[in-house]
Amino acid sequence: SLVGSEMCIRDSESVGIAGLGFPSIQAFPKKYDPIFVALMHQKAVAEPVFQFTLKPGTGSTLHLGGVDYSKVKDKIDYVNVNPDDGFWITDGSVQGVKTKFVIDSGTTLIIGPMDQVLEVISKLPGVTPHYNLDSLQATFDCSRPPTVDFEINGKKYKLDKQQASYGTSFGRCVLSIMGQRGLPMHAWVLGDAFMQGVSVVFDMGRNRMGFALSA
């Protein structure tokens, strides 16, 4: 049985991935519920809600069974989602480029369709694209990080310097946004690089997703 509604996500060896999407995309036999759906059916959680608050280094949390309001700075802004999509998907835009977002804590970077990522990069002064077969990465002067705006339901979320950078290459910072061909639904995958600045609430009971700046 569940003995706590919150667990720390610490630096440790990865031993697998627990899918937290909707049952419509589960890869294993239908007689087995995805882990959070199983917790719901067993009434092991107070509410059909979980919340990710990711932080660089230590301090990340996964709150099960409700919302921990101490993790957010402002009002949580909710958007409706369609469980038939399987993934947690919402409409949005990046630097004014309209698209769809898949919110995925199992992805390290921010990955978007090649054409849209190139369009976004063209709007970021000092950012240089680098092609590699079916993927696209970019670099920038580490002392001049770009300002990248993600907009969801009319609210903007900016990447800070740490979120925008994913290591270095030849003395330049590597942008945490990567382009890739053939992405499903031509959607962006907003992974940890985005979620490190935003606390995200996943509400399976009301089929909605909430966003707020993390405290």
Question: Which stretches of residues belong to each language-model region?
Answer:
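A compact, surface-exposed functional segment
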Residues: 114-152
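Short hydrophobic beta-strand that contains or immediately precedes a catalytic carboxylate
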Residues: 17-18, 100-105, 110-111, 189-190, ...
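Solvent-exposed loop/turn segments at secondary-structure junctions
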Residues: 24-25, 57-58, 69-71, 107-110, ...
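Flexible, glycine-rich surface segments
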Residues: 86-116, 120-125
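Short, small-residue-biased leader/transition segments that mark boundaries at the very start
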Residues: 2-9
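Flexible, small-/acidic-enriched active-site or ligand-binding loops
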Residues: 56-99, 166-171
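Aspartic protease catalytic domain
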Residues: 5, 54-56, 145-215
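Short, structured patches in soluble enzyme cores that scaffold and shape functional sites
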Residues: 19-24, 53-56, 63-68, 80, ...
